[in-house]
Amino acid sequence: YPILIKKFNNKIVYIISLLIVVNLFYLNIKFHPYQSLYFVNFLNLKITDNYQVDSPSLSRSEALKFIIENEKKNDEKIYVANASWTPMYNGKDMLSITKQRKLVFVGQEYGQADYIYTNFIYKSDEKYNKNYKIPANFTKIKDFKINNILIYRVYKKIK
């Protein structure tokens, strides 16, 4: 009888361990390349608003690919502004040379921009400093979320 209980307990431990490991693999694949979001599962959504989600700024390349793919002006330059502290220029490194040449980064000169990108990482508190406020002549065209957590947003100028 004690041997059966021990074998049964060992099987339960193995099954629970296996479920935990499988879940970890699943979440890492689901969140790739934003694996740091795995830890957000331990917090509620209200708390996650207080933390940087895209701290390595991986979303820049993804947002730039989206902008290029959705732009109708094939031969012209695309002017991209940045409403966050994260520099955009090195986000283009994961793009082909042809796509890189289409992009012109204008910093926070929103008047020159066709698109504005933000990953909500700011140098200062936006409650008091409106450096990154999106102008009224831009409209939101993309929200990228994982598990209802906003990673980045792209705006397009209204013509």
Predicted regions and their residues:
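Membrane-interface junctions at the ends of membrane-embedded or membrane-associated helices
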Residues: 1-18
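Catalytic lumenal/periplasmic loop and adjoining terminal transmembrane helix
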Residues: 14-156
